[in-house]
């Protein structure tokens, strides 16, 4: 159109929809244009800035204002620094986070293909100091750096695909200025200095663990963002403002990790809610909005890390109790009962990466509970594990399931969702539960001989009858 137009560069610490003046611009003219600039800015707001993190928009000059005239767009391609071959999943079976010798022994004995790993970022990089340089700043590395080295090394010995869960504790250097508590915070991305700290931690981790050996293959960004106030707190926000920040966090990680591994995905973390917002937001709406963001700002390989716990985490009989987990794309919940729903959603072409490639879908945290260590409660838990595996093994949209927890944990509010016990009464610590044997048999020649004893508990005569068509 007629008038004076500029190409505006928007940094991660700027909110494009709230700006009236864009400080970083280039003049443009004509219906099409080419602008060439250096990738690195030696000094911008106190840091050495890499434009790989910027998005770009056309703005129209209107008097003393600059009016947004297009969607902002990220770079479609980032030049790789390394190109390792993909580390394939050998099967769908996995474990949630663990780090002991017995844990890795179980990984090998059960032939699991994948694990998760919690990374508390404020203990990976502890703030400005010495030892690591990024963006013109010096930082100190913390003890979690050695922990990540250890877990990824152990995982590489048996070919495990590792997904790192990126967490920022609330009272830490990463605390968002609008945070109001919760277990974890949305990382602070409101200033150049705060952004640089976050990017520094991810850059160090990716440059160390995205190439051959000691590999992180996927990045689960924060935890259960639909329950934002509890698990990734940014204060009380409209969904789209919260999601905009979350997508920025995902993009920062993505644009770093993909320089070292072109097979990496970043995964959004969600609870068992679907169209209902038991927390702050409904996951289905958040995912649909993320698809829309990708269409407007340029698609990237994001995926889903879903947590299909039973509706009531304490009750193992989800096949009876989960009445609001239906076989509809508008189901209120997605639990072990109706995994077909999220499988159907991820396989819809309108949700594919660039309309061509299915996104990664991991069930990255879930388990059935044994309310006690009685024989009947343990049988209910094991039956639920068998049901879950039978569904996952048949649903092509689900790439892997990481059972949480590997072992029962007394810090989990009375839940006993692990494959092994904690010490209680006559029960020894880390005793394999019946569900341990179910998980070991899953995907092997012994599967049916171990699983079939639980048909009576589930009230079925045939495993095929648990699979349903989504409306």
Residue spans for each PLM region:
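Noncatalytic carbohydrate-binding groove/subsite architecture in carbohydrate-active enzymes
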Residues: 241-375
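Aromatic-rich peripheral "rim/lid" segments of glycoside hydrolase catalytic domains that contact
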Residues: 133, 211, 215, 225, ...
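Boundary/entry segment of secreted carbohydrate-active catalytic domains
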Residues: 68-120
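Structural preference for beta-strand elements that scaffold enzyme active sites
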Residues: 90-94, 114-116, 159-163, 216-220, ...
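Substrate-binding cleft and catalytic face of glycoside hydrolase catalytic domains
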Residues: 110-276, 311-312, 408-413
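A structural motif corresponding to the C-terminal end of an alpha-helix
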Residues: 147-162, 208-215, 252-264, 293-300, ...
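Short, acidic/polar
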Residues: 96-109, 198-208, 281-293, 379-391
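Beta-strand-enriched, solvent-exposed domains that form extended recognition/catalytic surfaces
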Residues: 1-84
């Amino acid at each position: 159109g007629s008038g004076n137009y500029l190409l505006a560069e928007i940094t991660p610490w700027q909110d494009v929809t709230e700006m009236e003046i864009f400080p970083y611009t280039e003049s443009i003219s004509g219906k099409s244009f080419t602008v060439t600039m250096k990738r690195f800015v030696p000094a911008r707001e106190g840091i050495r800035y890499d434009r790989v993190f910027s998005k770009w928009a056309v703005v129209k000059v209107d008097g003393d204002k600059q009016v947004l005239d297009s969607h902002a767009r990220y770079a479609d391609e980032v030049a790789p620094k390394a190109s390792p071959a993909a580390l394939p999943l050998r099967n769908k079976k996995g474990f949630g986070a663990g780090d002991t010798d017995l844990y890795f022994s179980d990984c090998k004995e059960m032939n699991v293909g994948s694990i998760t790993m919690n990374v508390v970022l404020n203990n990976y990089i502890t703030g400005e100091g010495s030892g690591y340089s990024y963006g013109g700043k010096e930082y100190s590395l913390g003890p979690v750096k050695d922990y990540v080295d250890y877990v990824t090394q152990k995982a590489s010995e048996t070919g495990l695909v590792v997904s790192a869960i990126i967490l920022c504790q609330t009272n830490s250097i990463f605390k968002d200025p609008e945070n109001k508590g919760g277990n974890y915070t949305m990382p602070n991305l409101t200033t150049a200095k705060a952004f640089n700290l976050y990017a520094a931690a991810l850059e160090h981790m990716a440059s160390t663990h995205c190439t051959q050996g000691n590999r992180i293959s996927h990045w689960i960004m924060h935890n259960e963002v639909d329950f934002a106030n509890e698990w990734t707190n940014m204060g009380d926000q409209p969904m789209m403002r919260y999601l905009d920040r979350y997508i920025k966090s995902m993009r920062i990680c993505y644009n770093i990790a993909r320089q070292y591994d072109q097979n990496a995905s970043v995964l959004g973390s969600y609870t068992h809610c679907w169209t209902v917002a038991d927390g702050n937001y409904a996951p289905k709406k958040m995912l649909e909005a993320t698809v829309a963001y990708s269409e407007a700002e340029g698609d990237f390989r994001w995926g889903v890390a879903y947590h299909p716990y039973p509706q009531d985490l304490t009750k193992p009989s989800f096949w009876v109790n989960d009445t609001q987990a239906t076989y509809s794309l508008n189901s209120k919940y997605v639990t072990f009962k109706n995994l077909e729903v999220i499988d159907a959603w991820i396989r819809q072409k309108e949700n594919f990466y660039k309309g061509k490639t299915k996104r990664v879908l991991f069930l990255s945290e879930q388990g059935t509970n044994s309310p006690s260590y009685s024989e009947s409660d343990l049988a209910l838990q094991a039956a639920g594990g068998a049901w879950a595996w039978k569904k996952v093994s048949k649903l092509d949209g689900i790439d892997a399931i990481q059972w949480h927890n590997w072992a029962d944990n007394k810090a989990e509010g009375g839940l006993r969702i692990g494959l092994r016990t904690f010490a209680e009464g006559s029960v020894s610590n880390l005793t394999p539960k019946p569900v341990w044997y179910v998980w070991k048999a899953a995907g092997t020649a012994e599967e049916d001989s171990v699983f079939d004893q639980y048909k009576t508990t589930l009230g079925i005569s045939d495993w095929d009858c648990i699979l349903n068509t989504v409306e």
